[in-house]
C-alpha cells in the first residue's frame, strides 16, 4: 500500500509539471513524507512526519530557478525570509529544516513550517451549518486572532495583501482552536515599494486600489479584513457577492456612501444596505457594534479607510475599535418560562446581581423571583466575585420561582423566504434565489432545534432543582423528627423524675399535657413524612423519563435531508432553475414533528409542576412543626426551671398563662377556621376529608386537627410574644 501511495505522489508531481524536481527519498533521518497537503501557483506543500510523531509542513517550489521570472523568484525568497523572521502566535511559525532535503537550494530555499492539522477557514465556511455564518463564539475567536496577526504585520511595516479564508488555518493546541495566517508570498514591506506592479491575491478580497493598479498602503489589508469578517458572520461577501469583480462591479461599488456596508441586487437594481445582512448568529449587541466597525474598514477611498475623525483630526482606529468591541463577553440566557434566548454584554467586573438586574429590566422577572443557573444546573447565588470567574460556559438559564416551564410553545416567526416557498412550492426559482431560500431554511431549522435542545436542557435542570429541594426537605425533616423525639424523651424523663416527688396534681397534669402535645407533634410529623415518601418515588420516575427523551433525532433527520438538497443543488445544479417543492414538504414535516414533540413533553412538564406544588405544601405545613418544636422546648425549660426552684405555681406562673392563652387562641382560631373551607380544605394539606364543624373534630386522631393546632398555636404564640 505504501508503494502505491508514493506512486500516486509521483503522478501528482508529474501532472503538476514537477517532473524536474529532485526525487525525494521516502525516509530521511527519521522523517518520512506522508502526503501532499496542497498546491498553489508554483509551490507545493508536503506533510512530513518524524518517527517520534512530530509533524512539519514543507513548502517547495515546483519549478527550477531557470523557469521562474525574477519577480517570482524574489517573491518566493521574500516569503521564506519573512516567515522565518516573524514571531506571533497567530502567524504560522517558520522553522529550521531538521534534515537535509534534496530540494533545499540556496537560490530557491524551502520553507519549513509548523503543521496546522485542522484545515483552513474556507473548509469551515463551506460546512452547511455555516451557510449563514459561523457561530458567534467562533467568529469572535477568528476576528481576535487574525486582526492581532495583521496588526503585528503592520507594526513590522508589512502588508499581507492576500487575506482570504484559504490563507487562514486552524491549529488545535490543548483542545483550544487558534487561527493562523499562512502564505505571505504576496506580503510586501512598505518601505521597499508601495506600488502594485501586478495584480495580486484573490480578486474577491483585495482592495479596490489594487484593482486600479494605484499606489497602496496598509489600508489594503483593512478592506480585506472587512470583506473576510463580513463573510465570516453572514456566510456571504458584502458587495454583490455573486458578481465577478470586473469594471462593472467596481463602477457599482465605488458609489457607496460611508454608511453602506453591503450591496445586493433587487429587481434588477443594485441596492446598498447599512446593516449586517441576516440571518446571522450574532447577538444584537455585537451586531450593532460591528456595523460601526464595518463602516470604518469598508471605505472605498483608501485615504479615509480605517480612520475616524474627531475635531477634524483623523486617527486610525481599525484594531483599537475592534479590540474594544471584542473585549466584551456575551452571555446567552435561556428564559425557561418564555422559551427565548436573551443575550447580555458583560465584562470582567460584572457580578451575578448585575446580570440579574439586566434580566429584570429586560423581561420583568424581579430578582427575588429569579433562579439563575449555569450550563450544568448549578445555582448562581449572589456574591462579590465576578460572574465570569464562576462559570465555565457562557450559556445560562433563568427560571421564574414557583412558575412551571412554558407549556404552550410560542409559534415561531416564519421567515418571508420560507413563506414564499410554502405558498408557491411548484414555482420555478432561479439558482441564486433558491440558494438563498435554502440558506434561510437551514438557519431557521437549526435555530428551532437549538431552542428546543435548550428547552429540554432547562427541563432537566428544573427537575434537578426540584429533586435538590426534596433532598433538603428530607434532611430537615429527619433532623427535626430526631429533635422532637429527643424532646419527648426529655419530657418523659422529667415526668418520671417528678412523679414520685412532692409536686402537686396540677403540676403533674402540666407535664402530662406537655407530653401529649409533643407526642401529637411527632404523630403530625410522621404523617407529613408518609405524604412525602411518594414524592421521592415520583421524582425518581420523572428523572428516568426525562433521561429517556430522544425527541431531537427526528428533527435532525429532516434537517439533514434539507442540507443534502442544499449541497446537491449547489454542487450539481449550479446556475439551473429549480422548484422548491421538496424543501417545502420538508418544512411542513419539520413543523409537524416539532408540534408533536412539544405535546409529548408537555405532560412531563405538568407532572414536574405538580411535584413542586405538593412539595411546597408540605414545606409550608412542616414550617409549623419546626415552630412548635421551638415553642415546646421553651415550655419544657420553663417547667424544669419552676420545678427545680420549688416555686412552680400553675395558677400564677407565666407558663400557665401562656399555655392557657395559647390554647384559647388555638381553639378560637380553630372554630373560625371551620367556616373557611377554602382556606383550610383538607385536600390542600394532607388530602383527607374536610370538616366544617368544630364538634366533629376528633382531637386525638384527626391529622387535620393536628396540623391546624400546630399552625395556629405558632401564630398565637408569636402574637403573644409581640405584645409583651
Residue ranges: model-predicted function:
Residues 221:
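Conserved catalytic-loop aspartate of Hanks-type protein kinases
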Residues 93-107:
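Short beta-strand micro-motifs within the conserved protein kinase catalytic domain, predominantly
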Residues 105-120:
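Conserved short submotifs of the Hanks-type protein kinase catalytic core
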Residues 44-65:
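Glycine-rich ATP phosphate-binding loop
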Residues 142-143:
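Activation segment signature within eukaryotic-like protein kinase domains
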Residues 60-86:
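Conserved N-lobe beta3->alphaC-helix segment of eukaryotic protein kinase catalytic domains
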Residues 34-41, 45:
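Protein kinase glycine-rich loop
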Amino acid at each position: 500500500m505504501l508503494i502505491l501511495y508514493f506512486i500516486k505522489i509521483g503522478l501528482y508531481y508529474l501532472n503538476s509539471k514537477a517532473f524536474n524536481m529532485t526525487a525525494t527519498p521516502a525516509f530521511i533521518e527519521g522523517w518520512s513524507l506522508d502526503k501532499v497537503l496542497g498546491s498553489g501557483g508554483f509551490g507545493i506543500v508536503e506533510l512530513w512526519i518524524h518517527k517520534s510523531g512530530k509533524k512539519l509542513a514543507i513548502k517547495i517550489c515546483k519549478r527550477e530557478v531557470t523557469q521562474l521570472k525574477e519577480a517570482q523568484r524574489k517573491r518566493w525568497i521574500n516569503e521564506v525570509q519573512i516567515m522565518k523572521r516573524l514571531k506571533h502566535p497567530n502567524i504560522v511559525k517558520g522553522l529550521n529544516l531538521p534534515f537535509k532535503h534534496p530540494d533545499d537550494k540556496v537560490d530557491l530555499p524551502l520553507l519549513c513550517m509548523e503543521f496546522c492539522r485542522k484545515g483552513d477557514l474556507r473548509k469551515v465556511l463551506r460546512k452547511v451549518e455555516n451557510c449563514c455564518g459561523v457561530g458567534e463564539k467562533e467568529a469572535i475567536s477568528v476576528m481576535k486572532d487574525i486582526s492581532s496577526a495583521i496588526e503585528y504585520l503592520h507594526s513590522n511595516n508589512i502588508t499581507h495583501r492576500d487575506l482570504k479564508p484559504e490563507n487562514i488555518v486552524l491549529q488545535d493546541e490543548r483542545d483550544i482552536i487558534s487561527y493562523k495566517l499562512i502564505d505571505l508570498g504576496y506580503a510586501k514591506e512598505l518601505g521597499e515599494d508601495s506600488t502594485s506592479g501586478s495584480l495580486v491575491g484573490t480578486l474577491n478580497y483585495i482592495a479596490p486600489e489594487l484593482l486600479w493598479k494605484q499606489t497602496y498602503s496598509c489600508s489594503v489589508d483593512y478592506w480585506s479584513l472587512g470583506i473576510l469578517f463580513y463573510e465570516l458572520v453572514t456566510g456571504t461577501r458584502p458587495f454583490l457577492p455573486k458578481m465577478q469583480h470586473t469594471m462593472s462591479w467596481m463602477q457599482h461599488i465605488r458609489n457607496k456612501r460611508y454608511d453602506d456596508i453591503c450591496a445586493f441586487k433587487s429587481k434588477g437594481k443594485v441596492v446598498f444596505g447599512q446593516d449586517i445582512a441576516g440571518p446571522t448568529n450574532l447577538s444584537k449587541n455585537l451586531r450593532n457594534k460591528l456595523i460601526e466597525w464595518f463602516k470604518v474598514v469598508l471605505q472605498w477611498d483608501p485615504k479615509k479607510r480605517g480612520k475616524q475623525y474627531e475635531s477634524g483630526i483623523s486617527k486610525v482606529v481599525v484594531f483599537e475599535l475592534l479590540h474594544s468591541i471584542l473585549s466584551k463577553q456575551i452571555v446567552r440566557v435561556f428564559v425557561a418560562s418564555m422559551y427565548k434566548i436573551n443575550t447580555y454584554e458583560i465584562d470582567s467586573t460584572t457580578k451575578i446581581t448585575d446580570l440579574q438586574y439586566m434580566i429584570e429590566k429586560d423581561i420583568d422577572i424581579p430578582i427575588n423571583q429569579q433562579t439563575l443557573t449555569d450550563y450544568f444546573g448549578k445555582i448562581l447565588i449572589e456574591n462579590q466575585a465576578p460572574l465570569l470567574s464562576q462559570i465555565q460556559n457562557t450559556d445560562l438559564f433563568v427560571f421564574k420561582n414557583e412558575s412551571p416551564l412554558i407549556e404552550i410553545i410560542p409559534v415561531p416567526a416564519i421567515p418571508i423566504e420560507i413563506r414564499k416557498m410554502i405558498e408557491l412550492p411548484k414555482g420555478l426559482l432561479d439558482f441564486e434565489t433558491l440558494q438563498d431560500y435554502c440558506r434561510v431554511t437551514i438557519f431557521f431549522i437549526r435555530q428551532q432545534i437549538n431552542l428546543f435542545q435548550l428547552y429540554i436542557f432547562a427541563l432537566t435542570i428544573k427537575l434537578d432543582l426540584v429533586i435538590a429541594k426534596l433532598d433538603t426537605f428530607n434532611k430537615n425533616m429527619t433532623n427535626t423528627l430526631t429533635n422532637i423525639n429527643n424532646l419527648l424523651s426529655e419530657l418523659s424523663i422529667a415526668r418520671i423524675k417528678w412523679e414520685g416527688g412532692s409536686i402537686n396534681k396540677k403540676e403533674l397534669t402540666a407535664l402530662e399535657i406537655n407530653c401529649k402535645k409533643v407526642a401529637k407533634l411527632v404523630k403530625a410529623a410522621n404523617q407529613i413524612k408518609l405524604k412525602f415518601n411518594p414524592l421521592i418515588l415520583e421524582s425518581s420516575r420523572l428523572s428516568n423519563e426525562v433521561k429517556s427523551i430522544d425527541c431531537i433525532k427526528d428533527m435532525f433527520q429532516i434537517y439533514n435531508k434539507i442540507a443534502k438538497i442544499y449541497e446537491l443543488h449547489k454542487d450539481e445544479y449550479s446556475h439551473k432553475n429549480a422548484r422548491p417543492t421538496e424543501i417545502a414538504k420538508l418544512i411542513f414535516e419539520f413543523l409537524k414533528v416539532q408540534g408533536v414533540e412539544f405535546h409529548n413533553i408537555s405532560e412531563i412538564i405538568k407532572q414536574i409542576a405538580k411535584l413542586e406544588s405538593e412539595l411546597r405544601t408540605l414545606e409550608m405545613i412542616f414550617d409549623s412543626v419546626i415552630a412548635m418544636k421551638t415553642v415546646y422546648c421553651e415550655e419544657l425549660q420553663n417547667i424544669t426551671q419552676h420545678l427545680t426552684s420549688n416555686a412552680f405555681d400553675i395558677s400564677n406562673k407565666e407558663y400557665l398563662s401562656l399555655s392557657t392563652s395559647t390554647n384559647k387562641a388555638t381553639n378560637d382560631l380553630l372554630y373560625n377556621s371551620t367556616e373557611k373551607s377554602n382556606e383550610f380544605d383538607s385536600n390542600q394539606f394532607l388530602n383527607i376529608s374536610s370538616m366544617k364543624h368544630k364538634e366533629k373534630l376528633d382531637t386525638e386522631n384527626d391529622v387535620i386537627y393536628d396540623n391546624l393546632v400546630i399552625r395556629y398555636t405558632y401564630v398565637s404564640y408569636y402574637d403573644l410574644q409581640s405584645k409583651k
